[in-house]
Every structure is written in C-alpha cells, then in structure tokens.
Design a protein with these regions (language model features):
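Active-site gating loop/helix substructures
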Residues: 38, 42-102
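Active-site rim loops that border cofactor/substrate pockets in soluble metabolic enzymes
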Residues: 62-77, 128-148
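Catalytic-core regions built around general acid/base machinery
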Residues: 87, 112-120
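Charged helix-capping and loop-helix junction motifs
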Residues: 108-115, 141-146
Length: 246
C-alpha cells in the first residue's frame, strides 16, 4: 500500500531525524539488499503547469486537476548529496522505474546536479514502462510518448532501452478494475519508439494480483517481478561485458 508505506517512512523520519537515517533503519528492519539514498533531505514542493497554464502545487493536486500536465518542476532548488551524485556518476546502469510518470519518476530528474551526474556517467539508461496509462497524468500515452517525455527532462544522455509489456491484458477485466492508478493498457508503438534511438525489450510482463481485506477484494495488475528482474540483469550483464571487452 503506497499510502501506508509513506506513513511508515514519515514516522521513521520523525524518530531518526533525517530521511537518510530513516531509510537506513528501515533497510535493516526489512533486511534489504543494496543501498537506498534519498533524492534530497530538503522539503520541496512539486509544481505542475497544466495545459490551461494553471499552476498547481502538490503531487495529489496535480494528479487530480482536470487538465493535462504540461510540465513539472520544484518550487525550490533541491540540495543533492555528494554521495548520491557519486553513485550516479559511477553507475553502470541507471533504471527509471515504473510509477506515476510526472509525479514519481520525473521528480527524480528535476535537479541540474542530477542531470550533470547522469551526463558524466558511462551508464546506459533503462526505462521500465508502465502497464497502464494513469488518469490525470498519461491519458492516451503510448510507449514512445513516455520516452519522449522522459527525454525532455534528461540532460544530454537519453533513454537507451525500454522494457515494455507485450502480454495480452483482458480488456473487460482491466475496465472493471480501472482506478486512479490504472486506466488503459499502454500500447507499444515499437517502430516509433525505435526511431527515438531506443532499443525495445519485450516480454509478457503481466501479473494479476488479488488484494483482499475485511471489507473488499480488489484485482490489480502488476509487473511480473521475476521476468522483469531477469531482463534488467540481462541488460546490465551485456553492457558490463561490452565495457570489459572494449
């Protein structure tokens, strides 16, 4: 649950005194592998400029506004830690994950320092495309639209790979369970996407999950994390092999 996860993180931040310490504490509790670094320790406000030129502040308000999003930016310039910038500069692979395009993914790119660090790295950029469009954010978006939008917010380096679903999604079931997170299955316009200089990696990535609690049962569509992990690792290993044998 997204909201519950946010509440747990906020509670831990209050206990630990900083976002980084909170993440370290939760990582130990959950026995997480790898390193998780916050985008910033600053309190920043996400701002959306809508297609009617209205300025809307706050993630929730941006998504709920009845017009399409034209652009997003921060009201304040975020301070980025040297540790995070160094991790980006020395990375072999930069993964832009699935999630709300304008209010979850792109906000991580809204910093000059982050863009510069990405440009200085030798990493390839991989985008894992969502299964569905999101109401209020990506209505009518195809895979190529996601790539074009991301490239607008990146610096000199652009998306190199996209992982996209080619598995069939039951349209009736999808309509029945459409909600604020998922609307229409995203169409892969492969030829148009490849013309953007992106290598398209595909598979049947659909995983249907039943959420049940005391009050109701809900069906949600998710990525098959086993297949997704395999594809990401394959891209990473292929690129590492290429660098080694240059």
């Amino acid at each position: 649950n997204h909201s519950l996860g946010n509440l747990i993180i906020l509670a831990e931040i209050k206990l630990q005194g900083s976002t980084q310490k909170a993440i370290e504490s939760l990582s130990k509790i959950l026995n997480l592998k790898g390193k998780v670094l916050p985008f910033t320790e600053d309190k920043v406000t996400l701002v959306g400029k809508m297609e009617d030129n209205t300025i809307v502040e706050g993630e929730h308000n941006i998504t709920k506004y009845p017009k399409k999003i034209k652009a997003v930016y921060y009201k304040e310039e975020p301070t980025i830690s040297d540790e995070l910038l160094n991790e980006i500069k020395t990375a072999n692979l930069i993964l832009l994950s699935m999630g709300s395009l304008f209010t979850s993914v792109i906000p991580n790119l809204l910093s000059k320092d982050i863009k510069t660090a990405i440009d200085k790295s030798t990493a390839k950029i991989v985008y894992c495309c969502n299964l569905f469009t999101q109401p209020g954010e990506t209505d009518d978006y195809k895979v190529s639209d996601h790539i074009k939008t991301l490239n607008k917010y990146l610096g000199n380096k652009k998306v190199n790979y996209v992982i996209a679903n080619t598995g069939e999604i039951n349209t009736e079931l999808a309509k029945k369970y459409s909600n604020e997170e998922q609307k229409d299955p995203i169409v892969l316009d492969k030829e148009k996407t490849e013309k953007l200089g992106v290598e398209v990696i595909t598979d049947n990535l659909v995983y249907i999950k039943e959420h049940t609690n005391t009050f109701k049962s809900k069906t949600v569509f998710r990525h098959n994390y086993v297949k997704l992990g395999f594809l990401i690792n394959t891209i990473a290993l292929d690129y590492a092999y290429m660098l080694k044998n240059k």
